[in-house]
Amino acid sequence: MKKLRKRKMSTYLSDYDYFLPEELIGQKPREPRDSAKLMLIDRKNGSVEHKNFYNIIDYLQKGDILVRNATKVIPARIFGHKDTGGVLEILLIKRITLDTWECLLKPAKKLKLGQKLYIGENKELIAELLEIKEDGNRILKFYYEGSFEEILDKLGSMPLPPYITRKLENKDRYQTVYAQRGESVAAPTAGLHFTEELLNKILDKGVEIVDIFLEVGLGTFRPVQTVNVLEHKMHEESFEISEKVAKIINEAKAEGRRIISVGTTATRALESSVDENGKLIAQKKDTGIFIYPGYKFKIVDALITNFHLPKSTLLMLVSAFYDREKMLEIYNLAVKEKYHFFSFGDSMFIY
């Protein structure tokens, strides 16, 4: 195990590293969803408990507000072929206009401006390369008949992160049970552990559940490559918080009730939308918020989250919520206890 430097508010990237055996990277979801392991971390006394996710109900209280990211993941990975027969992988990243998308192509250099790709046995989708961006991403215009969403659902596969090498048998397992709308290209994975039954039990306990939306982009997997983490350019994602939800959360905060965020995506949205008086603002906008140790949380009181990649901005976020040194000790403990890590991994509740 790596020795921890004695710097709690470090900006050194190496201070957010830990050793993870490859076999602990979750390759398939736990069945059922709420059977995942759950590590419980009490920030007041530093105690750590090991349970299953369905036990989380015992740690929720009447009056708590549970905030979910109800975004929907689209099957954004498709394959197209050129007239010459060459095959390219297309990963939809962000919709620009109704029929135009920013995409990642592999191999990217095989397609020239104006060239077309044909997708599906019957060429249900045709993609034309309109622009090559400075960062290497491509702008594609799609031609089709009928509903783009229905065609994509038929031809596309879920855009699993690169560390998951096993084929996903069921698309729904990379989707929360409460997903409603949106065009995310990665799942808000902390929410994957909830079942309908567990959510109903949580409601019956007197916990209020509210939904916000943040469209999760590929930037969530982008590694930090700068030695000083403050030099890292944070990706931007769009989010939406309704007037109704803002009112519920502000009233709960005023009454001293807990705001429990399901995942880092919900956390980033909430913490990006606070006025100078500490009130949550209802709005729809983009956020590039970078949360690292030293940040003072204004809305979130407790956090449900998975175990994140070494040297990632998400590990920095949870280190800001608790304590960098203690968090890395907890990660080392999770390795020892054979927890599963990353998107299809196990969960922790920091309260």
UniProtKB/Swiss-Prot annotation:
Keywords linked to the UniProt accession: Cytoplasm, Queuosine biosynthesis, S-adenosyl-L-methionine, Transferase
Catalyzed chemical reaction(s): 7-aminomethyl-7-carbaguanosine(34) in tRNA + S-adenosyl-L-methionine = epoxyqueuosine(34) in tRNA + adenine + L-methionine + 2 H(+)
GO cellular component: cytoplasm
EC number annotated for this UniProt entry: 2.4.99.17
UniProt xrefs under Gene3D superfamilies: QueA-like (3.40.1780.10)
Keyword Cytoplasm in record: yes
Alphabetized InterPro entries for the sequence: QueA, QueA_dom1, QueA_dom2, QueA_sf
GO MF entries: S-adenosylmethionine:tRNA ribosyltransferase-isomerase activity
Compartments (UniProt record): Cytoplasm
Record's keyword annotation contains Ribonucleoprotein: no
Pathway(s) where this gene product acts: tRNA modification; tRNA-queuosine biosynthesis
Xref: Pfam families: Queuosine_synth
Domain of life where this protein originates: Bacteria
BP GO annotations: queuosine biosynthetic process; tRNA wobble guanine modification
Record's subunit section: Monomer.
Family statement: Belongs to the QueA family.
Biological role stated in the UniProt entry: Transfers and isomerizes the ribose moiety from AdoMet to the 7-aminomethyl group of 7-deazaguanine (preQ1-tRNA) to give epoxyqueuosine (oQ-tRNA).
NCBIfam families hit by this protein: PRK00147.1, queA
Name by which UniProt lists this protein: S-adenosylmethionine:tRNA ribosyltransferase-isomerase
